[in-house]
């Protein structure tokens, strides 16, 4: 049980001008970007960041519901905070994100100590919602809405690499995925608003930006305008050309892509635009066509392989990463083996893996051919072993190469090393030389000779 001393309780009840907050983020990059914006809103309101959640006047959990283990963590955290609120009634408890959208008012009934439950579409309305809480209301904001253009300065976790949302929501209907029901329909931001945000990051000495979207290749489908060739006027490809020449930004990334919409025109743009990094995250989910059909993914393995071939024909050293699900309902041993074969055939740099987890309000959740937990565990262990082996083999190609590394900071586990990432998004540790003068700043790009490769990181020395 969380307890406070009398001194701590007195300190907690200090003047409201020194209110503090704590945000815990679960899940994807979109959630991380949302949390940065909510932190910016809170600081605009006069809150300061607490040193830990036990000292915060407001605690916010930005949640994920893509798998059930993420939900269990949230409820565990909420249980501890609910006990704390019984001792400190002025404590504000907020749940944001996908779990909040999924559960809505039922979450308020399950955890009555909560003050505010808000879905992802309401991130930019946090200040107004907290105003309602201050009037004594318990608030649930989960109705579908147009996402207002964010005018709040985000509190960025990095001073070098910035997230930039370009499209919200998802119109796909994958049979296993809860995202469309909790993130809403696709809503693209206008190019000029995106460019303005990136320009502000450049003015603040950011060097790298990552464009974000649940289905980023869908960017612009909902915006007006059609070219004389009959395609949409504003696409991800067009946006890359539009933002490429912003001075100060040296690296551009984007995620997450959908194979159904990954075009040759986009690949050509990535090849031509030297700021766009040679790293592509393109989930395949299964290596079997029948399972892909059951998943309602809208492509087959031949199409997926063609995309990878087209990328590597122009950028042979490009990093290819992906997502995969094992033990989908009805998946046979042979269909599972097809997934392992695809990983071996393509040679991914990394694959994020998960055993299938039934999610509320998705078609696959109610199918009768669910696989056992034992099968899920076995297949997940096997695929993870293969992914690690493949990643280790892929990273061997960097040995003795000279790679450009963007410095992000000191290695928190080894103060004699700095750390950063290559253009292909390989985490790289660099030993700080003792026998020569070496001055560096965050955001510098340095040439590093790679001398050690592990499955998910590299180590090297200054050239």
Curated annotation (Swiss-Prot):
CDD domains, per the entry: Radical_SAM
Cofactor notes: Binds 2 [4Fe-4S] clusters. One cluster is coordinated with 3 cysteines and an exchangeable S-adenosyl-L-methionine.
Catalysed reaction equations from the record: N(6)-dimethylallyladenosine(37) in tRNA + (sulfur carrier)-SH + AH2 + 2 S-adenosyl-L-methionine = 2-methylsulfanyl-N(6)-dimethylallyladenosine(37) in tRNA + (sulfur carrier)-H + 5'-deoxyadenosine + L-methionine + A + S-adenosyl-L-homocysteine + 2 H(+)
Lineage top rank: taxon: Bacteria
Record has S-adenosyl-L-methionine as a keyword: yes
Cellular compartment(s): Cytoplasm
EC number: 2.8.4.3
Domain TRAM: 396-463
Main location: cytoplasm
Xref: InterPro entries: Elp3/MiaA/NifB-like_rSAM (IPR006638), Methylthiotransferase (IPR005839), Methylthiotransferase_CS (IPR020612), Methylthiotransferase_N (IPR013848), Methylthiotransferase_N_sf (IPR038135), MiaB_methiolase (IPR006463), rSAM (IPR007197), rSAM_horseshoe (IPR023404)
GO biological process annotation, one example: tRNA methylthiolation
Family, per entry: Belongs to the methylthiotransferase family. MiaB subfamily.
Cross-referenced NCBIfam families: miaB-methiolase, MiaB/RimO family radical SAM methylthiotransferase
Function: Catalyzes the methylthiolation of N6-(dimethylallyl)adenosine (i(6)A), leading to the formation of 2-methylthio-N6-(dimethylallyl)adenosine (ms(2)i(6)A) at position 37 in tRNAs that read codons beginning with uridine.
Entry protein name: tRNA-2-methylthio-N(6)-dimethylallyladenosine synthase
